[in-house]
């Protein structure tokens, strides 16, 4: 029988909240006896927006805004039923997007 792996991808605009959430997930999985691989920092996505400062003229005067999306990857190897239950009950901040694949 092949071993089961849970892959968790975390995304957030703020890296502090993201690292805190990853630490909570790792601590919960280790407490229940599962093996952990990660958190692995994935490349940061950078989206740049360029906007005219004035509403009608001055094409040379522009302002740039950027949005960074930080990502982390955590693999949980050989999870126990207790691990899955504790991960379901885990309370994480609202600014973190979580994607779980079995």
Swiss-Prot record:
The keyword Ribonucleoprotein applies. GO terms for cellular component: ribonucleoprotein complex; ribosome. InterPro entries: Ribosomal_uS10 (IPR001848), Ribosomal_uS10_CS (IPR018268), Ribosomal_uS10_dom (IPR027486), Ribosomal_uS10_dom_sf (IPR036838). GO terms for biological process: translation. The keyword Ribosomal protein applies. GO terms for molecular function: structural constituent of ribosome; tRNA binding. Part of the 30S ribosomal subunit. Involved in the binding of tRNA to the ribosomes. Belongs to the universal ribosomal protein uS10 family. This is Small ribosomal subunit protein uS10.
